Amino acid sequence: CIDCVVPIGNKLEDSKWWVIDWKSNFISGSENSDCLPGNYNYENMKEEMIKHHYPLQSHLYLLALHRLLKWRLKNYQPNLHLGGYVYLFLKGLPDIKLFEKSVEKDISPGVFIGQAPINRINYLDKLF
């Protein structure tokens, strides 16, 4: 089931809506078996996404969100309102103390973001 849906914007009718799903996958480094935030880079998370069919899952979640918004949001337009998906690999997120010390405030380890493939979602909506 979908973990979380959030609107990003000032007003609900103008917001982009995002699906958030958290994962507890263990991604170890090539030279060790430790589970460290550095192991949760884009390439490793992409590989994990494909391995576990998460792109398919994200499409199904976005289709469900698309149908909900079409039903509930007046003047819904997928290209304006459907944002995409965020996968949070919990074991890859940096410790808050490290984040507070960071000058760049980079929290990208453990965060995998994708835009909604609008044409594909519309096609799936018509398909079934």
Question: Where in this protein do the model-derived segments appear?
Answer:
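Structural signature of nuclease core domains in nucleic-acid processing machines
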Residues: 1-128
